[in-house]
Amino acid sequence: MSKEKENKEKSASKPVKILTLDTETRGLFGEVFRVGLYDGSRYRATNTFKNLKTVLSQYTTKYDCHVFIHNLDFDISKIAKDILPEADLKNSIFINNVVTVFKTGLNESQITEENEIISQPITFHDSSKLVMGSLKKICEDFNISQEKAKIDLKDHILKLGWALDADGNPTNDPGKYDDRESQGNYFMKVDPYEPELNEYLRLDCVALYEIVTMLIEISGLPIHEFLKCPTTASLAMKVYQMNYPEDYEKAISTNYGYSKWGEFTEDFIRKAYYGGRTEVFQSELNGGFHYDVNSLYSYVMKVNPIPIGKPRHHKGDKARNVFKYWYSYRQGGGFLECDIHIPTTLHIPPLPHRMYKKLCFPVGNLSGIWTFEEIELALEMGAKIKEIHQCIYFEKTDYIFKDFVSYFEEIKNTSDGAKKTFAKLMQNALYGKFGMQRVRQTILPVTEIETCEEKGYPYVELFNPVYGQEFIEAAVPSKAPYIQPHIAAYVTSYARILLYRGLIKQLEKGDVAYCDTDSIACEAIFDDDMVDDREYGKWKLEGILEEGLFIQPKTYYEKYADEIKPEEIEKEISSFSRNVFNYPEKSKVKQYRLVKGSETMKFKGIPGAYIKKLNRGVYYDILEKLKSLQARQERGEMITKKEAYYSIYKGELKRRKFATMLKMGSDDFDLKQEVNKGILLTNRQKRNMDYIKNTSRPHVSCDF
């Protein structure tokens, strides 16, 4: 038995111990000055992680230790010199260059002369990959009791006189208090032994422990299965697999394998895997409505059949006959490669198409691959198929997500707190796991070179002085059976179809200004039978718009009007009424309240802290500049990049990711990176925009 396998078996034989850890640092780039560790009953705090390593080692003699940290990438960077030399890179997980699970191995100092292990490996998990968002927001969503929840330092910081506004200027005004700036100032100055700081740190650890243990309990998974799930998506897949085994087996019944046929089929289908639809149709909307679909992806997964089983490949006339058969009888499902003409008269065309390095929805002559259902939608809108090249056809379909979604829909609608949040997480995360890329960049120990060479995996050799030895980054394919791209492609296709029908319906009644995956901003109100605040697949009114300024996809400003909204409250019934009239203890009463109009600002690629500093004036200024640039272009003037660039902020200092610094060979994991953000206003958009006339036209495709 190998030493690695022996150590794994010893670790697995021990009971699991869940711990939570948090660090406080002198700003984004400063050193750690306080570290807290909580095991569910006992809390410890020291000024360095090095001091806590001894405590953790003591735990490992009895337990298989799993330490959860919220935003692991940041904390691991801060303690890299204390922990990286012991890294077990083979069993650590890096996703999109971010460390998600970090495992330490054994080193010589952890072994006695008798070769008895006195310290087992420790696994660090990133809780923010299981439940996204700030710890404060998660505590609110999970209804963590006040004595165990994250505390707000605002009053304390104001009392100390260390509060800052959004521009970093001192302030005593609670209304001008900026949380990010003020907390940054506080952590730069505070004494490590200040009671308020230590209570803040303790409750961060306690709150995270409550959240993690709640997740384990609600998931219903054995703890060892839960700990195999590094992300929300992997957790959702595990819950689906364990609780709905028959549906799961159907979902993975398409065997892509590693044959040439499997590679061809997967590549073919992935070309039909498009994302959500985000488009600006007009840049200004003066009065209108903003609607969102309730749980769009969950809904289409619940009510639509998904292809399963072994697909067949057909070409030419056979492919044409297969599609014709499906079109007549709707039996099975599949993907069609064809040349299709989309009428140039359509203001909002139906089919997604990759052009100009964007996902566009053009008119004209398109060559591509789409689901049968989206081709059917295009034909409804007057499209004409000019030639069919080939298709992948699944004879069988099934409602493989109906029970899964229905179960969590019931929990979401009848629960609150942790259960409701968990239900949302499970429904939203599952489908994307089926579309996961098969090949991923993976960091491995240098001992894996031989395996990579045998299997033909490309790799590069690297070295980091803190790690103390060479390692590699390799492109390793996954054999996971749940990688089923046709499922993800079908789910997104169904979602686009539902959105499109909403767009066309509203276009018949007035202007449509904007859409984003599951939302529409438009001039006219939706029909009553399409609207409901909770029902899956129905449209929920998010707000009545006074004004909308839409610059580009995911970059817009909206001002909502004041509204009078009904709400139900529980009112206690007096004992007299209960006794005399046999009334219940509590009764629901409808009342009305004035909701002041709010503002929504989105800006793609800009961190939330900077978006908070924006205002309507910024979006209006950009729009006016776009009109000016358009007028100049129409006059034939040349416009330089400098003239077309609109700066949002300059000189922001950002941290590099832990994996980036590891691969760069740096011994400084706090290396600063200066970032400037802005928008180049002459970039090609997803439609031909006319900012002056407040309209747009779809691009014209000329593929054939």
Where do the protein language model's features map onto the residues?
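Conserved acidic
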Residues: 4-20, 28-32, 38-704
